[in-house]
Amino acid sequence: MNHILAIDQGTTSSRAMVFDEALTLKSVAQEEFPQIYPRPGWVEHDPSDLWSSVAATARAAVERAEIDGSLAAIGITNQRETVVVWERASGHPIHNAIVWQDRRTADLCHALAEAGHEPTITERTGLLLDPYFSATKLKWLLDHVEGARARARRGELLFGTVDSYLIWKLTGGRAHVTDATNAARTMLFDIGRGIWDPEICGLLDIPMEMLPEVRDCAAPFGMTRADLFGREIPILGVAGDQQAATCGQACFRPGMMKSTYGTGCFALLNTGEERVTSRARLLTTIAYQLGGKRTYALEGSIFIAGAVVQWLRDGLKIIREAGETQGLALSSDAAQDLVIVPAFTGLGAPWWKPESRGAVFGLTRNSGPAEFARAALESVGYQTRDLLEAMRADWAAGAEGVLRVDGGMAASDWSLQFLADIIGAPVDRPVVRETTALGVAWLAGMQAGLCPGPEEFAADWALERRFEPQMEASVREAKYDRWGRAVRAVMAV
């Protein structure tokens, strides 16, 4: 039997998983790497950490699977928007990677908006003018690394999102490519025409010579160096992490929704061939591109989801591991009604307030670790409802009523029950929770001829548990109203 290696390069760790051609998980390897915070609001990664952790976990997963040379394809999924610039000749990065959470270009984005550029950028890219996306991060690098722009014009420097950088490293510098879903997150890509936008690149003074070639999500992206796995292996599937999860959740029908809970939270609504223009400040993006055909989605992005649990552990030091939060939440005093707005790096969709910062409301002398844990988990549910309310406002006729969930926090029954309660709709957790890796493994396997097409793959999607709403509507709306007042207070400061 043939096997597929799925590389999942995330914000805090790199993971690698081996699947067989029936898409059964055979092995997993994971390695965390350091986060770099040079200044408040700045977030960086050392690209060598990204590469070394990917190489180590990929080799480890293949070894643990004991697959005896039957590796047939590789798929790559990745943290999106994060920017790497490297030398074409040596492969050496010219600066740390600037991470999607980084807010250093907030003033630049504000200036561009004041100059009237946001409508054109949004119409073409589907994105809002925000530091979250790659374009202004890339401009910052070209502005602040001496000689970088001139070198880029001479073809000496290359830009890529993390997938592109990893493909370059895996292929030994033979392929400078990306896929449509990652390109769609740069704020440089015209998602209607499927090309890099010359006008936006010109506005930001970004040499187009440094941009990668854009391909379908299932396509030949290059062959790995022979020394990595004993022979050359084709890279046949690439998608940004949230789009890969959309595929892994088999959300192929317009109206289907999924939400992934990792460091952040990302909800996607499949809108099919229709590019829905959001009136509620959501993003219009590419869900996946197969056979040259683009399928679109509305997306809402929350910057802080699982990261709020990391804050409980690393910042407040009231837990030692994430799994403790569910027990604490169960033991909390619900009457306390503590509210945490975790705007540590600003507010994401649908507010888009990069300057906002977090706050805690409703503190009393009896507020302790249990109440903080409960409020932290509840904040993720509240933010998800914000996204779903905006999606329904934009595309009410097509949205289905069930939300499919995945990611680390989806393991928490308490969190998913609260999510169902606060959104007032069923929440479905799949049997296979590694949907991001599964999605890109399927893309690579389909391109290799090992896995079925979308319809047959969707028929095999299996439900592990459905969480039905149990909270009374009056309680739900009162709690959500309190959350809304807390968010408005944060934005007013």
UniProtKB/Swiss-Prot annotation:
Q: How is this protein activated or inhibited? A: Inhibited by fructose 1,6-bisphosphate (FBP).
One Pfam short name: FGGY_C
Q: What Gene3D superfamilies does the database record attribute to this sequence?
A: 3.30.420.40
Whether Transmembrane counts among this entry's keywords is no
Reactions performed catalytically: glycerol + ATP = sn-glycerol 3-phosphate + ADP + H(+)
User: Which residues participate in sn-glycerol 3-phosphate binding?
Assistant: T11, R80, E81, Y132, D241
What does the entry list under GO cellular component? cytosol
Q: What is this protein called?
A: Glycerol kinase
The organism named in the record is Cereibacter sphaeroides (strain ATCC 17023 / DSM 158 / JCM 6121 / CCUG 31486 / LMG 2827 / NBRC 12203 / NCIMB 8253 / ATH 2.4.1.)
Q: What is the lineage of its organism?
A: Bacteria, Pseudomonadati, Pseudomonadota, Alphaproteobacteria, Rhodobacterales
Gene name in the database record: glpK
